[in-house]
Amino acid sequence: MKSTQLVPILNRRFGTVARRYPALTRWMANRLSTEQFTGLPLTVLCMGMVVTIGTLSEVAENIVKSEMMVRVDMVFTDWLFQGRTSQLSTFFYGLTAFGSAYVTIGIGVLASVGFTYTKRWRNLMILWLLMLGVGAFVRLGKREFSRPRPPAIAYYNVSGFSFPSGHSATAMTLYGLLGYWWTRRLRQTRSRVWVGAATIILILLVGFSRIYLGVHYLSDVLGGYLLGICWLIIGIVLTEWQRTKPDPKHSLA
């Protein structure tokens, strides 16, 4: 719906207030307009960012102060450890590599070659901005919280602190962004659904593999996902912003 169509609706709904503050009414109409990305889509993404940051802050606080979260982490990790099998361990050990630095950087390089060949320079810039950003914040989080990894149950040796999960954060950011770009280029809804579902499944499996292999707690993976979502939202905003030339009528002012 266009902002020009929303203004009369807001005037009817809010009456005196809307007529007294016409500039505010136009601003609200622009924020709810579906005609431009800077309208309702950007509003929803900004709200999603606020909710995600708030949830991430809550999780981070709870791993320090909440005995309940620590207990849930311990119980869930121990339950998976008790049911661990060699076949599934081998499967998840191979799968968890999709969140490793070597594989994600390799995929990023391959994507960069494709973007360079097709001269999609902004995609190239957005990709590495997100990769560097999420990597820096993972390092910052690990150093800030210095949370030890699960004791004596890891399927393989791994160093460093536990919160947040770098594999989960990077998988959410990289595969989420590439999946989003891919679905945007597809015309058939069915194809979009398949690509979107495959992307989500891969991200979830990478995160679950970290818990199953005993190298992260549940809250570590959740924190990694939330951090990755923040950067993914930034990537989506930058993508759509550069595709849409803002109309002065729909500016953020």
Kindly give the residue locations of the regions a language model identified.
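Juxtamembrane membrane-interface segments at transmembrane alpha-helix termini
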Residues: 85, 136-147, 206-211, 234-239
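Terminal transmembrane helix and immediately flanking juxtamembrane interfaces
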Residues: 1-123, 222-253
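Residue-level signal for helical boundary/lining positions with a hydrophobic bias
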Residues: 95-96, 142, 163, 216
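Membrane-embedded catalytic cores of phosphoryl/pyrophosphoryl-handling enzymes
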Residues: 3-13, 154-253
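Membrane-interface loops
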Residues: 64-65, 70-75, 106-197
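Hydrophobic alpha-helical segments and their boundary regions
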Residues: 46, 56, 62, 88, ...
